[in-house]
A protein has these predicted regions:
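Domain-level signal for Mg2+-assisted phosphodiester chemistry and nucleotide/NA-binding surfaces
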Residues: 1-108
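Extended two-metal-dependent nuclease catalytic cores across DNA- and RNA-processing enzymes
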Residues: 1-4, 37, 64, 90-255
Length: 256
């Protein structure tokens, strides 16, 4: 059983994969500017900057490390969305400059050293994990911070939730929040290999989402695009996470 304690201070959720990528390349960049690079231990530098990040965020948001949680991805070939889109995320190209061993190091050595709270569940991506918990606690807390650079999280934006990247930039500002999931389902997501609906462009989608929801569905039906849209929205909208997986995660979490 994993405890999530509700406090007066903000609760911070990290998309674990995003953070590791960010810190990995930020550490490499930092090392490149040092004079004696040969005598710098990468993992020691990574850990030192990781701790600095935690301290900086605690100070920025007036919270404590005990209020920080990391959402962890399941294995890509076990993601529940694969059942609905066989090519989901299949076209992602590995960065040859990135050493994936840092994931295991973070989830074991760094986790134990800093007593990190990593949350994962079979078949769920990190954003699924965070979305499910977010829904459970959003009416019980004063402030939630989500740290990511993934626009999928934009749908979690509300008056109590701030969604930022590690540069502390609000990633929701560049998006139209009105009917956001509908918009994203219409235009697709190349990074996840989700194709757009028909030949709808971003400009067309911007116009469509101004309509009342019932008119949007009527328009899609009239143009024989409703099936494509439904296929996309099922993958994109967190409300379509299978109930069984939601229950699996929540059965192992105690919100106190």
């Amino acid at each position: 059983m994993f405890d999530i304690k509700i406090t007066k201070e903000p609760i911070v959720f990290f998309d674990c994969s995003y953070y590791i990528f960010h810190r990995y390349f930020a550490t490499k960049r930092w090392i490149s500017f040092q004079k004696d690079t040969e005598n710098i231990n990468f993992l020691e530098a990574f850990e030192r900057h990781f701790e600095n990040d935690l301290n900086k965020l605690c100070k920025k948001f007036k919270t404590t490390r005990s209020n920080m949680y990391f959402g962890v991805d399941c294995y890509r070939n076990t993601i529940w969305r694969n059942e609905y889109l066989k090519t989901y995320k299949q076209h992602r190209v590995e960065n040859p400059e990135f050493d994936r061993d840092i994931f295991d190091y973070f989830k074991t050595t760094i986790k134990d050293k800093f007593n990190l709270k990593l949350i994962n569940c079979d078949n769920l991506e990190a954003d699924d994990v965070i979305a499910i918990i977010h829904k459970e606690i959003t009416n019980k807390v004063n402030n939630i911070i989500i740290i990511t650079n993934d626009s999928d999280y934009v749908q979690l934006k509300n008056d109590k939730t701030t969604i930022i990247n590690m540069q502390l930039k609000d990633i929701t500002l560049k998006h139209n929040l009105k009917n956001y999931t509908i918009y994203k389902a219409l235009i697709g997501d190349k990074s996840d290999n989700i194709k757009r609906v028909g030949k709808i462009t971003k400009a067309t989608a911007d116009k469509i989402i101004q309509k009342p929801t019932n008119e949007i569905y009527e328009w899609l039906k009239e143009n024989e695009l409703l099936t494509e849209y439904n296929n996309n929205i099922r993958i994109i909208d967190f409300n379509y996470i299978p109930e069984e997986l939601i229950n699996n995660l929540l059965s192992n979490i105690n919100i106190i």
